[in-house]
Amino acid sequence: MNNRPIPRNQASSSLGRNDLKPGLFGRSSFRVQHYSGTNGISPIGSSPRTKISPRYSFASSFATSESSLRESSYFDERPPVQDTGVPKSSGLYYSRASPKELSSIDRINDSSFNGIVCAGKTHLGLYKFSPQDKSIDCMHDFVSAGNDGNRGSNVQMGLGKRSKRTKLSTIADVKAGFHNHKNYVAICSNSTVLSIYDINKTGSIDNPLVTNCSQHVRSVNSFDFNMVQTNLIISGGQDSCIKIWDLRSSRSRTLSRADVNINTASDSIRDVKWMPHPTACRSASQNDLRSGVGGAAGYKFASIHDSGLLLKFDLRQPNQVEKRINAHSGPGLCLNWHPYQDYISTGGRDGKCCLWYVGDGKPGTDFLQAGNTSVNTPHSMTSNLPTNLSVVPDMTINCGFPVTKLKVRPCYEKNVLNSLVSMSSMAEDFGVSIYSLARKYIPKYNLSTSSASLGFVWWDDNLIFNIDKDNRINGWYLDREPTVLDNMPKIVTRWRDIEGNGLLFIDQDRGGYQVNDEVPANIEESKKPPNQRVSINSLSGTAGGGNSGGGSNSGMIGSIKKGISQTGLTSFAGERPALSKTGLNFSNKSLATQSMNNSHSNSFSSYAGAGPGPLNEVADYSGIESPFLMTIDLPYILNNMRVSQLPPERKSLYSPEVQAIRESPVKVFKFLAKELEFSYMQEGRSGEMKNATQLSNVNEDTTKKDLMVKFGISEKSTWTALVNKKNEAVEAISKKSVSTKEGSESLIESDGESSAKSHESDDNSSDADKKENAKDGTMHVQEKIDILLELIPICGHNASVYSYIDDLPNFKIWILIRDSLLWDLERLSVEYPDEKLPETQSTDQIGQPITMGNDDSLASDTRSYMTSDLNYFVEEHPRALRSDSDEPKDHKKPLSGLKSQLTKIQETEASIDDSLNPPKMLKKPDNPIKQEQIGSRLNDDSDSAVLEDDDNEEKSDFDTQIKGIPITNKRQPRQSFIDTYMGGLKSPIGSSNANNEFFMGRVGHSLGHSSPGSKGSPMASLNNGEFTYPGFKRMSSRNDRRSSGSLFLSPLKRRESSTAEFFNKSPMRPLSPVAPVSSFKSNPTEFLPPWNTRRLLKQIFKQAVEMGNILLVVNILFLFQNLYQLTSTEVLKNTLAQFIKILHKHELFELSAAILKCSPWEVVINADGGQSLVPIFCDKCGKLITNEPSKEKFTLEAQEKGNSMPLQRFGYWYCDSCKKPNTLCVFCERPIKTLAIGLLECGHEGHFQCLQSWFLDEGMAECPGGCMNQIRL
């Protein structure tokens, strides 16, 4: 920039009268009248500044030199900037880390000095930036040690002797003065005192403090300097009072009484601003035509309140409110006047930035074209009413975050839509966003820093400074910063909403941020008259403070009027600049859509002209169209095709409850977050699963033995013993197979004896360490099996939750995960040795269906169930052990084929062992049976695991483990998932149950899409009503154990279909087992199946991250991270921390607490509560308790003594100002030193423990203070 700094002795000078030529401020046809030479005397008699300098510079800092500015009469019109590509250099030009905490920033309004002022809790610094060196240097700190501005005023304020370092309040932002008072800066020394500093007094003997303004009884939230009457400063705070101070009336260091008091009769004031002076942006003739009076920029001001109310006042009539606008649905946080137009921008906690027209007349530019014919509207017919509320803003920008700081770029534009509005929020991951009013959906610039922005200020129309939470000062040149459109990709395709119903594409024509003023368009008429002046009595109450100060207000207002008449600013007649008559360019299509939307967030205001005339000539306007969004509802069409094929009773997919949930994505998110299971861990789990031998006690052993005797099961039950018992049961019916059975029994017994002998010899040769390792491995496998048995019902439950809201993609994902877990469970059970099963297995795992004949009269509860292997959970039930009742009697086959199959297997043993058991691939097992199992399994893999005999009998997977168990019947062909899904869905219980409404229920709707089971699977026997899944009896028993300590008690579990019913009724057909892991040691990736659980979970996790499915991401990480190691621990902790923040935003605090409680990972949450302040006021003197002197005193004492005992006497239960303690406990009459106190209805306070002892332990019902107040407990 060419604004070069000047020497120290010339720092107080500014542009003289001769230097202030019309061309300095003129632009286009707007000519500035000369300052009157006779009225050049300043009304400020003792003010240190006597010259007036402009607040903003309108020329580019690099395009025009200072001399050319003074010689030229007009500014050149700059055409709209055309985007030519992404700029190569970044706009970040200045960056400096401050050693002290920063909270606010403002510019020094002196064009000859490149300075900004920054304030923090212990810092008020003057900074100078150099464009040549790209540096920012701190010139002086006004509150550092030895430069305490309050050291001479502490006695007058009654605060006693303070410490060397002053603590400033960070509630309100620092502000700098204008023109004659441009060397003044204002900051709150504490929450209720406004302090004025002189930045020219930087010497060691100078006191920079000018005065203190202290009349507010509660915190000051905002203050502002007047641009015209520079000696006036306005302030507003929590006491809902607006106070105006005249710095000329300060005869001492303290102003204890404001010159003007206005009680707004509303809630607390968040922000208050003077109307800025137009600084010669229009001619005097236009102003006179508009208002007919002199300039009113020094009189008007506005305030915004906690209720979202925007009030506009005129100082000449302080008892009346000119405009009263309900600006926001929630608290309004900030406001900012447009520098050159009659508009106010407001920001609120509702995440909206609204633009309001607040002029007295009609706007020169309409957002929606208004015709010349005046139409009576409800607003136009209420001119005589005391109030006139503005309902619809002229422009609304939905930001998505609370707008805490808001400023309009100080640059004049003919069209107000070309103005830039910058805003920021103190929330995390937010910098400074700059929007163009011409394009409110996409910001023009996003100025991001390493941490959240705390404040910013425009130095000129191109340079903006901001500070962040890392205490860094950053400066940005916007002409070097790429726009958001430059970095936005054109090729983007997304699902339209959470239902996945349609696709979104973006228009390839990006457009720009400027409004085209050339092409007019016909817009339908929409009128809105100006708001009328509102009496202060029309508010919620009459202003007490305003009336009380009426006597002094009249003299003050007269002085202000007299001072304004002497400033020579009478040539700047008119209140605000008139807008150009050149029309805006809105298209019919974009405005037709907007005209139908009457919402608060997507609306424009329009005004009707009074009639023909120079000011009422309104042209056609047009704006920038939004990008075209084209949708393809292909999933919707396919879904309708699927619904049309369903039975009539199933076409009513959504119940009223589901429709209520699907109304908004927020309700869907809350429902899923509450219903889904996020963890299988609970309290006491580690103690319950220490090892396999501690899973049961003596009572369980006794129950097990009793049931084994009842069902006729021996204690050493094996698969071979089951075959023998089966053959013995069949012996009475099939007498022809006696010899075959005896041969098979002798063969199996001989093999069993040989295997037992070899196993005994191996055990004798092994040492104790080998036995211990085998035992540990068995226990480790058992623990994995137990975890899988916990995860499988959770996956089923999550699938049912997604099916309840008809979210089919996520439903299929959880069904796929469930089937992969079943595959893992099958692998573990295959590797689990039968002889090493824990003796404490639950008895409902031991059961085998033995059904003779085809008698349908037999009840299912009288049948016997036998098994001794965990394969029963997932394996297909062998046909050799199944009842023949499920097949016609004509197709029954005798068991004589057993001997031939066993003989055939024995003949191939030698070749299998020689060819498939090389030394490098496999170790020699402990017994020949295990070696034979491995060899046969590898043979199955190489030869497609199918051995067909002459009868087309298919060998089962059991024959890879236990030699001598045939599969006699061929499986029926399986039905694919698509066939089941698109065809008629049948009940999993069977067609015989006509009254079954399993698929008509909420959860049943999801289960109908489960993968079907084949007739060879154990679940297929459910359809015939002859078999119940005993393996899931164990799951249901575990669910009972989990229900007491479960993470979330889902409401779906209390409905008709529970999780156990889901698995009892779901037609599952798990995948076939593969070879053990030991057989893949040569090349693991070559034999890794596509349904491998870890690979599948990683793919699902990656897809969920890309699609932004946070619930699925957290579910997968929480459930499967410890078992499958899907990602790093750092990524897991960051994901969990972000998910906790999302839950807090949706007010799901109980759910987030439960997740943190059951999380096995330590998650550090940067809670926003660390930024909260709890102000404590003294009960005696009413002042804010800070106790900084006593804190430093006790700290020094602790350092001298070398221990922390003196610090225990420090607290906030006493006041350093009045030297008195706060209210004592009503029970023990001791100071209350903690924030956890009990407050009774009568007003007495006490320790929580004392009141608990009085009311609960002693059973008292009266106040312990003796006031006879009855406490109702």
Swiss-Prot record:
Compositional bias of type Gly residues: which residue ranges?
A: 542-553
In terms of PANTHER family, this protein maps to: GATOR COMPLEX PROTEIN WDR24
- In Swiss-Prot or TrEMBL terms, this protein is called Restriction of telomere capping protein 1
Instruction: Offer a single GO CC term for the protein.
Output: cytosol
Q: Where is this region: Disordered?
A: 1-20, 69-93, 521-559, 741-777, 839-861, 880-971
Organism of this sequence: Zygosaccharomyces rouxii (strain ATCC 2623 / CBS 732 / NBRC 1130 / NCYC 568 / NRRL Y-229)
List localization entries.
Answer: Vacuole
> Which residue ranges does UniProt annotate as crossing the membrane?
none
Role summary: May be involved in a process influencing telomere capping.
List compositional bias (Polar residues) regions by residue number. Answer: 1-16, 839-848, 898-909
- RING-type zinc finger locations on the chain: 1225-1267
Q: Which domain of life is it from?
A: Eukaryota
Sorted UniProt keywords: Metal-binding, Repeat, Vacuole, WD repeat, Zinc, Zinc-finger
Record-linked Gene3D superfamilies: YVTN repeat-like/Quinoprotein amine dehydrogenase
Q: Which SMART domains match?
A: WD40
Show the Pfam families listed in the entry: WD40, zf-RING_16
What InterPro entries does the annotation carry?
Answer: WD40/YVTN_repeat-like_dom_sf, WD40_repeat_CS, WD40_repeat_dom_sf, WD40_rpt, WDR24, WDR59_RTC1-like_RING_Znf, Znf_RING
Q: Where is the composition biased (Basic and acidic residues)?
A: 754-777, 880-890
Identify the stretches annotated as WD repeats.
119-164, 166-207, 215-255, 327-366, 448-486, 639-679, 784-824, 1058-1101
Query: Acidic residues composition bias: which ranges?
Result: 941-954
GO terms in the biological process aspect are:
positive regulation of macroautophagy; positive regulation of TORC1 signaling
Which family, according to the similarity comment? Belongs to the WD repeat RTC1 family.
GO MF terms here are: zinc ion binding
